[in-house]
Amino acid sequence: MPDQRTAFSRLQLVSESLAARAGDNGPAFTFIDYLDAPDGTGHTLSWSELDRRVRAVAARLAEVSAPGERVALLCPQNLDYVTGFFGALYAGMIAVPLFAPEVSSHATRLVGALADCDPEVWLTSEAATWGLRELLDRHPVPRPKQLIAVDTLPEQDFEPVPVSAEQPAYLQYTSGSTRKPAGAVITHGALAANVRQVRAAFGVDENSTCAGWLPLFHDMGLVNLVALPAGAGCRSVFTTPFAFIRKPARWLRMISAYPGVITAAPNFAFDYAARSAGEDLAGLDLSRVEVMINGSEPIRKETVDAFLAATGPLGFRAASHRPSYGLAEATVFVSATVTGEAPKTTTFDRTRLGPGERTAVVPGDDDRAVPLVSVGHAVGQALRIVIDGREVPDGVVGEIWLHGPNIAAGYWRQADRSAEAFDGYLIEGAPAAGWLRTGDLGVRHDGELYITGRLKDLIIVDGTNHYPQDIEVTVQQAHPAIRRDRLAAFAVERDGHEGPVVVAEHTTRVKLDDELRGEVGRQARAAVSRRHDLRLLDFVLVPPGTVTRTSSGKIARAAMRRRYLAGELG
């Protein structure tokens, strides 16, 4: 069997696909700006205009650096980000998708990534240069040889530098919080392979429209809103995460305005969108939406149900809601539900979801029931459920291992960490070597994949495994003063025994006093005791905005545990 990680020969690279459209005057990328216009102002580049701008960026990069060097993308989320990314690829350099310092909540991550990869050149927009100079003054980051505002460059002729599929295209910094930043090395071949896999899974072609608001420095945003449109030759329409958070209905209005829409978001976004339904969406037609990818964080049955209930009257089809699974180390996409099938939920016995345990399906009203949403089947890559290096049969929980042409080449200049993650050896398997250990736990049931949680996040008490997300759901349902999806459960050791701690934000609507704080704590502890037969070692109620989240919106439990142990949470 050939090594799937190097099976690139039949793939057209994404940068080649873009260059091939240099003579096309049709619309390519549209950025909708809500900053100064409540209804949004669209700014569009045709394929030919985009190609000319990209060549101008590449020409300038070639003047100040060399192929193979790192180029940091520090543009605001607009068309400059797109031209900067492809400019680096045309120049044969390694793009590093990051963000302008205006995303202040991720400043530590930005500084860490810059220090890790030491890019020679920073690309940005003219309006953002002041923020980068301030960053250099305030933080110990390596100074670039050149800071370039891509929106000020004159057009120049430039011939794209030939690259091989095995060469790095960009470094995708993961949003983990337990160790130093890690840049997954995404090769040109891996990107092309993942674009092909996404196209196969969701039927993306030239008539599709990729639309959304995901941050372009995040793997799901970069692939779905930038690389996929270029590889498929379809239109991209995007706005900013801030525009969505301010008014979630903007997302639904956007996807209703274009044909054949493919859009993607984490689970929490569907919660937001469902709550925005009502008069604000009167007259909206979502019948042309082909695919809404739900991924990047645990997918909740109640979210899926609420979203379908809110958007069904607007013409949205349940089968268009596509729960999926992916991660940066696999470029982004791994698996999805089958075209034409509505989301599927199975209720498992939560006491039998530990690694190596055989699962049991129970009725939904059983006290032990936990509903899990299927994320379907892997597309174009091998997926195995593994315990101690051996594949386990369907129905047994294990770590998800992956092998395919879309898998990253490792972490940038971190050999030990790369070997730990990317050199999994499968006993009695084929291929035997080169498996990606994802760190995610899952189970196959009736041939479909269900994600049960993160291996490193498991809370083990008296030999029993507990998933933190299950405890978090129980706590947030215990009292209306607890803010939804803004809490973290993790384990700490006390007096020689390990037990759970929950840190939860209260809602912005409540005025907290000692009496209410005590009431919330008592109800949270009682709910966890009833539901999970666990005693919380501590329950901490904190103000809104306290709970740390990753760039993709996931709860950063390890970071919260660290902050708790450091006494930072009161």
Task: Annotate each language-model stretch with its function.
Residues 485-490, 501-502, 525-570:
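Conserved C-terminal "lid"/linker of ANL adenylate-forming enzymes
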Residues 16-46, 168-171, 178, 326, ...:
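AMP-dependent adenylate-forming
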Residues 29-86, 103-111, 183-192:
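Conserved AMP-binding/adenylate-forming core of the ANL superfamily
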Residues 260-264, 276-367, 382-384, 389:
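Gly/Ser/Thr-rich phosphate-binding loop
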Residues 27, 148, 155-173, 179-180, ...:
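Conserved pre-ATP/AMP-binding loop-to-beta segment of ANL
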Residues 122, 256, 263, 404, ...:
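AMP-binding/adenylate-forming catalytic core of the ANL superfamily
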Residues 192-209, 219-261, 276-279:
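Conserved AMP-binding/adenylation subdomain of ANL enzymes
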Residues 373-381, 386, 390-395, 399-461:
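Conserved ATP-binding/catalytic segment of the ANL
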